Amino acid sequence: SITETSENPSARLWVDAYSADGKITLVNGKNTLDANAIGIGGDFFLFHPLKLITGSYFSGNDLMQDYCIIDQDAAWQLFGSNDVVGMTVYIGNVPHIVTGVVRRPQGRMEKAAGLTSTVVYVSYETLEAYGTSNGINHYEIVMPNPVDEFAYGKVKEGIGIDEKNVEIVENSRRYSLPNRIKTIFSFGTRSMNGKAIIYPYWENLARGYEDIIAFLTVFMLLLLLYPVVTVIWCF
């Protein structure tokens, strides 16, 4: 018999992450900061590779969960500098090590998506224990998709929650031509949402870019049709 050996025995069949949003208070000496927070679990930063100014990410799978990542505004408010990797802030009187400082995007789209103020990234456990958490409300996974919508179906089956309370988005073909056409034809009703769901900033951004790309697709199709119309007119 033939036995195949994996080139990478430690490889995983899937990678996932979950997160919760909320509020948290950070303290450094006399400086206190109340900030929006995202409590992360799993490989969150693999899905969301934020722009690091200094330092590195931490993993929600780490044994120790006393880490945090802050943006440049938080770094200046707490320390007066953004060179603060390895320094300590207190969250609920518990010391947490700053592993990285990220640049918060400040473009028009980002602000409209919800990135209007300081955001701090901590472990889900930290947010639950020492902050105000809205509970896990985002789950993301990368997994094999041997046939169309296999992964989508597995996630939908495994969620086990009424679809009125969740929205499942399959991202691999999000900006494909068929999806762009679908977005064009849903113009006017697309912004209507009967579900009690608040999108995270990254989903708001993705939906915003869907609209932009759909508009550009309409423009492209019109340009493709123009020579045909011109030929017909000439005849």
Give the positions of each predicted feature.
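Juxtamembrane interface at the cytosolic side of transmembrane helices
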Residues: 223-235
